[in-house]
């Protein structure tokens, strides 16, 4: 069984932007892809993490992962918008082959707590 290729874009936002603005970035880039004719498969906020090395004098960043598929033309539109944004300090888009992996849950998040509660309920 063959699977269509898809794209994964990981981008890092400045750590000092407010939570509402982070949500607006998630929505903005998702909507931009849809307008360009792509299908958004997954949009996950990975949270604030320490960077391996300082980027633009920042030691931390807010990581966001965006999985999408389309004809590839939408990637240029997305990356141009990210390049022009002062809030995005780094981005990378990679073409993936194979099936889309199951979404991972960040430990300590509401989704992780909900998974633990469901697992405990099914164990009883």
Curated annotation (Swiss-Prot):
Name of a matching Pfam family: Ribosomal_S6
Keyword terms of this UniProt record: Ribonucleoprotein, Ribosomal protein, RNA-binding, rRNA-binding
GO molecular function terms attached to this record: small ribosomal subunit rRNA binding; structural constituent of ribosome
Bias type Low complexity, positions: 109-124
GO cellular component: cytoplasm; ribonucleoprotein complex; ribosome
GO biological process: translation
Disordered: region residues: 99-124
Keyword Ribonucleoprotein appears in the UniProt entry: yes
Entry similarity comment: Belongs to the bacterial ribosomal protein bS6 family.
Task of the protein: Binds together with bS18 to 16S ribosomal RNA.
Protein name, as recorded: Small ribosomal subunit protein bS6
Species the sequence originates in: Synechococcus sp. (strain CC9605)
Gene name per UniProt: rpsF
